[in-house]
């Protein structure tokens, strides 16, 4: 059954109807936002948008759905749209936005895009997801990249560590932490977190061209190659440096382990930096940010977008206000400083950003210019959700020992992706 067909069936489940009933706007001055930004840093960043809208006379109604990967939120959104009560807008990732556009459920905000010259300031790679057939139905709030390592500086100094320049040096650094009695690697044992880390491992092991061939092009020779096997071998090496209590841990709790010095490092997208900021920690003083060893010069990106749905006429002014406010330079700066991300607009100065933020902005511009700005498979920017889900399934089974060897993991990855395509 197609995505469009599922929506056209309507919301038949009782739970779907109960969720959808909460989406009816009280009046035309209310912005209803479905999102999964429930951690401290995320909530603080979202408040920048809320406050900017409040100055324009708009109230805000959160429809929060916890879960860092957004899977639960997308299930809720599907129910709301199917029931005929979509929110003003929803946080959304990649191919999910295209699904709603193809189903004819998104509003057309192209006039706003033309007035604001958004096509000139937003990377072309992102516009693939904000537009369909030249019509804008979503706006990017930020640009995140997943190929980062976050390190507690005091712990790093305590163990005598240095920035790892390649994968072997990273393993050696983790080994130092282990011998010092510190948890080397903070990880949450959830499929999306494990897959996010594996994105970086694949790009490091095979290089950015291999990552593109395997995950963007879905080239079967790359997927079944010795390089992919080695990538799983390297994932197994990192798994050995994770504490035994990681299963089911939320990503922000793993970040908190690094913030508190209970763990040395975390491999995570730069939304983790928002948690450091919320804890009043400073880049370079309290924590360090490095590109995952072997991925310098490339950016594996995702972008949080706000997708706008077809709503009644009295709710459209709120949509316009939200879209214009989100794309304003002031909000792009204020939001992303707190969130830990880079602005989605390429014309924003980095003057107000910390050292990690400046590096993120510079890296994105450089990668965008030389063709190494590539979508994260784990974050739904390399392939549609069905393929990403198949990827999650194989990676998490390998991490948790249900798949016993790298050879078996490669075989299952090829089969799962071929089945999902």
Give the ranges of each region predicted by the language model.
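Conserved N-terminal structural module of periplasmic/extracytoplasmic solute-binding proteins
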Residues: 23-98, 103, 115, 408, ...
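Extracytoplasmic/periplasmic substrate-recognition and gating elements
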Residues: 51, 159, 240, 278-342
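A structural signal for short loop-to-beta-strand junctions that line the ligand-binding cleft
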Residues: 79, 86-88, 118-151, 183-184, ...
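Hinge/lid segment of periplasmic solute-binding proteins
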Residues: 94-146, 171, 197-199, 357
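Short, solvent-exposed loop/beta-turn-alpha elements that line the ligand-binding surface or hinge
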Residues: 110-124, 162, 189, 205-230, ...
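Extracytoplasmic/periplasmic solute-binding protein
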Residues: 136-141, 171-220, 263
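C-terminal capping/gating helix-and-loop segments adjacent to ligand/active sites or protein-protein/ligand interfaces
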Residues: 140, 347, 362-417
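Glycine-centered hinge/linker elements that transmit conformational signals in sensory
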Residues: 174-176, 216-247
């Amino acid at each position: 059954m197609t995505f469009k067909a599922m929506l056209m069936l309507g919301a038949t489940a009782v739970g779907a109807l109960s969720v959808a009933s909460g989406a009816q706007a009280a009046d035309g001055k209310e912005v209803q936002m479905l999102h999964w930004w429930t951690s401290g840093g995320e909530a603080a960043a979202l408040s920048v948008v809320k406050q900017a809208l409040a100055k324009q006379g708009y109230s805000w109604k959160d429809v929060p759905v916890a879960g860092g990967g957004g899977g639960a939120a997308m299930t809720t959104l599907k129910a709301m749209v199917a029931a005929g009560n979509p929110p003003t807008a929803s946080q959304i990732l990649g191919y999910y936005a295209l699904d709603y556009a193809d189903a004819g459920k998104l509003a057309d905000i192209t006039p706003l895009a033309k007035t604001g010259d958004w096509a000139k300031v937003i990377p072309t790679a992102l516009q693939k997801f904000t537009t369909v057939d030249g019509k804008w139905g979503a706006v990017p709030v930020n640009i995140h990249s997943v190929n980062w390592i976050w390190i507690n500086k005091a712990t790093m100094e305590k163990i005598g560590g240095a920035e790892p320049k390649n994968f072997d040096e990273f393993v050696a650094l983790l080994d130092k932490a282990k011998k010092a009695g510190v948890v080397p690697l903070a990880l949450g044992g959830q499929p999306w977190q494990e897959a996010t880390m594996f994105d970086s491992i694949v790009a490091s092991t095979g290089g950015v061209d291999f990552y593109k061939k395997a995950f963007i092009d879905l080239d079967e020779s790359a997927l079944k190659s010795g390089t992919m096997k080695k990538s799983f071998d390297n994932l197994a090496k990192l798994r050995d440096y994770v504490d035994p209590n990681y299963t089911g841990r939320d990503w922000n709790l793993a970040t908190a382990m690094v913030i508190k010095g209970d763990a040395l490092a975390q491999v995570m997208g730069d939304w983790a930096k928002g948690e450091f900021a919320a804890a009043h920690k400073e880049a370079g003083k309290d924590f360090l940010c490095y590109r995952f060893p072997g991925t310098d010069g490339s950016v594996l990106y995702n972008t949080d977008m706000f997708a706008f749905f077809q709503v009644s006429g009295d709710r459209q002014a709120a949509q316009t206000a939200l879209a214009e406010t989100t794309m304003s330079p002031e909000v792009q700066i204020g939001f992303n400083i707190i969130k830990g991300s880079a602005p989605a607009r390429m014309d924003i100065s980095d003057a107000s950003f910390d050292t990690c933020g400046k590096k993120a902005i510079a890296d994105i511009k450089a990668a965008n210019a030389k063709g190494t700005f590539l979508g994260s498979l784990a974050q739904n920017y390399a392939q549609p959700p069905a393929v990403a889900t198949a990827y999650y399934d194989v990676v998490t089974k390998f991490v948790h020992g249900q798949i016993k060897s790298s050879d078996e993991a490669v075989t299952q990855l090829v089969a799962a992706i071929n089945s999902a395509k």
